[in-house]
């Protein structure tokens, strides 16, 4: 049976409880019997899902939202130091716990699988959660996105396995001690926290050093950054299992065959060929499934059982999620916000769509990312037949002088892309309705609130 409540976490208060990572931890604590409370900037389906579990969720941040008897205050790196609930916690002497420390405590006593990498963490974690659940292993899991319904990003299971995303953005993945660690890829991102690839490699090396004695590192064989990390950690003595299409991979991907919005994957593992279906399109998602397969095998689960169970995975919200179809136009939501992710999703859709036109509504995420990768984002958009580019979604950042979406638009046009800038999101449904024709695919793409436009575009198309 999974352990109970960590010490001093029986009455936690979460600042920003509606966030993907925070809400998952809050949900697991509530399911373990904690009296959970918290606050968030706005009302959401996630807040409602937490209330259904007995949590108290306040909208807005105010000192009075923090109960005097709270045993700890949980924060993420996105919470600013001047938050009034943080100030109140200091007055009351209530300890402040980072989200990553809270998650690490939840994994104590279990067999953790930590999924790391610049791209693909949510999908791979979800694949593991679904396949292990399908096999009756009742894992606990904490995912950075909902599987199929609000609040489905986390679960307290009665089994002894805990699957979690391991976030490198703020180095919080250094807090975990996994039995199995997955590294999907290693690239420069999160430019506010990392100045160079050497800093990125050093951070991932620290993560690998945290693998428990006798544990396993599952790492991509095809990705340049992952191969370099493998070279750097080989001397540490950790058991390494590589996967990919490279001939020297321990788990060798023999083929990935597109079948509409699905893929058939054939792998060679320990001399045995296995074939299974992944219910989302794209070679990158097929590789994520192979990483999940290798991680499960590292924990002693039969490969054939895992291969069959992976077919139960039907996707996660915002990862090439079909939102609907109107007037012969399908609208699909993509979380891609880094050029590598954008390219992978657009190539996947091109393989699935055949001759259909692909229209993209892209919202850049973060000024710092646009400053460093804006040119590459524009080049990725050249893979679409036409694109609408919105203003930058700031998230936690303040504006950077001179950094706007125009950097992306100029690069896209230089690469031959058809790009339309739109500054008012409210205009997007009409703009897309004027561009789209039956048979087209429309992708809303980005990590910000561009996802809200999918239903609005469908509504506008229904009135054509």
From Swiss-Prot:
Protein family according to the UniProt entry: Belongs to the MurCDEF family.
Residues holding ATP: 117-123
NCBIfam families: murC
Function description: Cell wall formation.
Any single GO BP term: cell wall organization
GO terms for cellular component: cytoplasm
Catalytic activity: UDP-N-acetyl-alpha-D-muramate + L-alanine + ATP = UDP-N-acetyl-alpha-D-muramoyl-L-alanine + ADP + phosphate + H(+)
Catalytic activity, EC: 6.3.2.8
Keyword entries, A-Z: ATP-binding, Cell cycle, Cell division, Cell shape, Cell wall biogenesis/degradation, Cytoplasm, Ligase, Nucleotide-binding, Peptidoglycan synthesis
InterPro entries: Mur-like_cat_sf, Mur_ligase_C, Mur_ligase_C_dom_sf, Mur_ligase_cen, Mur_ligase_N, MurCDEF_pg_biosynth, UDP-N-AcMur_Ala_ligase_MurC
Location within or outside the cell: Cytoplasm
Listed PANTHER family: UDP-N-ACETYLMURAMATE--L-ALANINE LIGASE (PTHR43445:SF3), UDP-N-ACETYLMURAMATE--L-ALANINE LIGASE-RELATED (PTHR43445)
Primary enzyme class: ligase
GO terms, molecular function: ATP binding; UDP-N-acetylmuramate-L-alanine ligase activity
Pathway this chain belongs to: Cell wall biogenesis; peptidoglycan biosynthesis
Protein name: UDP-N-acetylmuramate--L-alanine ligase
Top-rank lineage group of the source organism: Bacteria
């Amino acid at each position: 049976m999974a352990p109970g409540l960590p010490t001093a976490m029986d009455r936690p208060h979460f600042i920003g409880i509606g966030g993907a990572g925070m809400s998952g931890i809050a949900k697991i604590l509530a399911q373990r019997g904690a009296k959970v409370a918290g606050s968030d900037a706005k009302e959401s389906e996630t807040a409602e899902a937490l209330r259904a579990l007995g949590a108290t969720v306040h909208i807005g941040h105010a000192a009075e939202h923090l109960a005097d008897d709270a045993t700890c205050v949980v924060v993420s790196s996105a919470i600013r130091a001047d938050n009034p609930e943080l100030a109140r916690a200091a007055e009351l002497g209530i300890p402040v716990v980072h989200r990553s420390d809270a998650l690490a405590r939840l994994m104590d006593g279990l067999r953790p699988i930590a999924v790391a990498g610049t791209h693909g963490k949510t999908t791979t974690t979800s694949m593991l959660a679904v396949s292990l659940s399908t096999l009756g292993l009742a894992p606990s899991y904490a995912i950075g996105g909902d599987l199929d319904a609000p609040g489905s990003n986390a679960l307290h299971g009665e089994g002894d396995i805990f699957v979690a995303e391991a976030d490198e953005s703020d180095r919080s993945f250094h807090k975990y001690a996994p039995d199995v660690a997955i590294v999907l890829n290693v690239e420069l991102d999160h430019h506010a926290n990392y100045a160079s690839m050497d800093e990125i490699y050093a951070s991932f090396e620290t993560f690998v050093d945290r693998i428990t004695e006798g544990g396993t590192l599952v790492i991509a064989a095809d990705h340049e950054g992952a191969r370099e990390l493998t070279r750097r950690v080989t001397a540490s003595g950790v058991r390494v299992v590589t996967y990919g299409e490279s001939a020297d991979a321990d788990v060798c991907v023999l083929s990935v065959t597109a079948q509409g919005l699905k893929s058939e994957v054939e792998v060679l593992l320990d001399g045995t060929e296995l074939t299974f279906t992944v219910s989302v399109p794209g070679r990158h998602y097929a590789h994520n499934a192979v990483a999940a397969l290798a991680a499960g095998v590292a924990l002693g689960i039969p490969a054939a059982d895992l291969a069959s169970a992976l077919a139960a995975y039907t996707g996660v919200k915002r990862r090439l999620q079909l939102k609907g179809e109107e007037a012969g136009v399908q609208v699909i939501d993509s979380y891609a916000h880094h050029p590598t992710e954008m390219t992978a999703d657009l190539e996947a859709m091109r393989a699935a769509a055949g001759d259909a036109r692909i229209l993209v509504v892209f919202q850049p995420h973060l000024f710092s990312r646009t400053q460093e990768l804006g040119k590459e984002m524009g080049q990725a958009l050249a893979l679409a037949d036409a694109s609408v580019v919105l203003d930058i979604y700031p998230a936690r950042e303040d504006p950077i002088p001179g950094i706007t979406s125009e950097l992306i638009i100029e690069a896209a046009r230089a690469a031959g892309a058809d790009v339309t800038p739109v500054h008012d999101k409210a205009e997007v449904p009409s703009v897309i309705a004027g561009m789209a024709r039956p048979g087209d695919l429309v992708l809303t793409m980005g990590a910000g609130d561009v996802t809200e436009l999918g239903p609005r575009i469908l509504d506008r198309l229904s009135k054509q």
